[in-house]
Design a protein with these regions (language model features):
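Interfacial loop-to-transmembrane junctions
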Residues: 231-254
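Juxtamembrane boundary at the C-terminal end of a transmembrane helix
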Residues: 264-275
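Membrane-embedded alpha-helical bundles of polytopic integral membrane proteins
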Residues: 2-178, 182-213
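C-terminal transmembrane helix pair
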Residues: 229, 254-256, 260, 264
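Short amphipathic alpha-helical segments
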Residues: 207-215, 219, 223-227, 246
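Membrane-embedded alpha-helical segments of transport systems
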Residues: 153, 183, 221, 248-256
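Hydrophobic alpha-helical transmembrane segments that constitute the membrane-spanning cores
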Residues: 192, 196, 260-265
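Short helical (or helix-break) motifs at transmembrane helix termini and adjacent helical loops
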Residues: 152-162, 218-230
Length: 275
């Protein structure tokens, strides 16, 4: 078996295992159980972020305590700025800045973006966690569709990029990512969203549009973490997931696209109220 086929098989087995857990939790667990899972996942993501950095243990402990306070104070922060907390808006702002630098500045990301900058990790992962808490209270099928839409984009980009990719999209930022892979991911995602809109009553036209608008940010999450890893001199953020690397390697696109999904949803619903 070729190395490419072996890698794809390993990634597929891991993806199926993760998908089974995610589907079971989203469709059959209570809000409390799902929120506990989201909290544990977010904590693991932040621990992995800190493990890649070269900061002192004292600094890591301080930020770890701060992170736990943030995600455990969801009701407090959510009550300040309903339905999006102030922390979430800061995280979304960071992703908008990242998107601007990727698409309009040829991928020249700010030097402030690094694994050693715990403030960035704190904001982005906290925003992801708080948005997931918010989405759990809505239709579970829509939440599942959002998660799988991003996974479909990643899978389509990976398969097409590996087999047909020739032209780098942003060679200085991530030379292995290709234009062909990007197109493959976008087409796969668009097909998935159309099917979700046609066959799932929980996915309204507005929901479908938010899923489409969020996909460029899935790309941003992917490129952003590629930049961070290149800057830190590491290939993966961990090794817990066979074929994928670390948790951050698996959910890098979700960290960006899920908060932006809620942002666009609120934006479109607000705009719709004026017409």
């Amino acid at each position: 078996m070729s190395e490419l086929k072996q890698e794809f098989l390993q990634r597929s087995i891991t993806a199926i295992f993760i998908s089974a857990i995610v589907i079971t939790l989203i469709l059959y667990s209570s809000n409390l159980i799902l929120n506990i899972f989201i909290s544990i996942l977010s904590l693991a993501l932040f621990l992995e972020w800190m493990s890649v950095s070269k900061s002192s243990n004292g600094k890591r402990l301080i930020f770890l305590i701060l992170f736990i306070i943030l995600i455990s104070s969801n009701h407090y922060f959510g009550g300040l700025f309903e339905p999006i907390s102030f922390i979430t808006m800061l995280g979304i702002t960071v992703w908008i800045v990242v998107a601007y630098q990727i698409f309009f500045k040829q991928g020249r990301l700010s030097s402030n973006f690094a694994f050693n900058n715990f403030w960035i990790g704190l904001l982005l992962i906290s925003a992801f966690c708080l948005v997931c808490f918010q989405l759990v209270t809505g239709p579970r099928i829509f939440l599942l569709a959002v998660i799988f839409n991003i996974a479909v984009f990643d899978t389509g980009a990976y398969i097409i990029g590996k087999n047909l990719g020739k032209n780098s999209f942003l060679p200085k930022l991530s030379p292995n990512k290709t234009i062909e892979g990007l197109i493959g991911g976008l087409m796969s995602s668009l097909f998935f969203v159309i099917c979700a809109y046609l066959f799932l009553e929980e996915v309204s036209l507005v929901n479908a549009l938010t899923m489409i608008l969020a996909i460029p940010f899935a790309l941003c999450g992917d490129y952003f973490f590629s930049f961070l890893k290149r800057k830190a001199g590491v290939k993966d953020t961990g090794s817990i997931l066979p074929g994928h690397g670390g948790l951050l390697d698996r959910v890098d696109s979700h960290l960006a696209a899920i908060p932006m999904t809620l942002f666009f949803s609120l934006l479109l619903h607000t705009a719709g109220s004026y017409f």
